[in-house]
């Protein structure tokens, strides 16, 4: 069972933030270190993937766009 501290540490490590108060879910969803199982845990505990950021995209839209970009980069290289 994951503890809140473990979740916070995984999110911080993935984004390079050192302080949880600086953490930004949108940065996490755009990082190369997204853990789908961790996202599942967040959703199971009430995290809303439809939250919008300043570019008017939701958390899940940012994730999908990032994955598409990574796939394009892989195909082109």
Swiss-Prot record:
This is Uncharacterized protein 16. The lineage of its organism: Viruses, Varidnaviria, Bamfordvirae, Nucleocytoviricota, Pokkesviricetes. Keywords: Early protein.
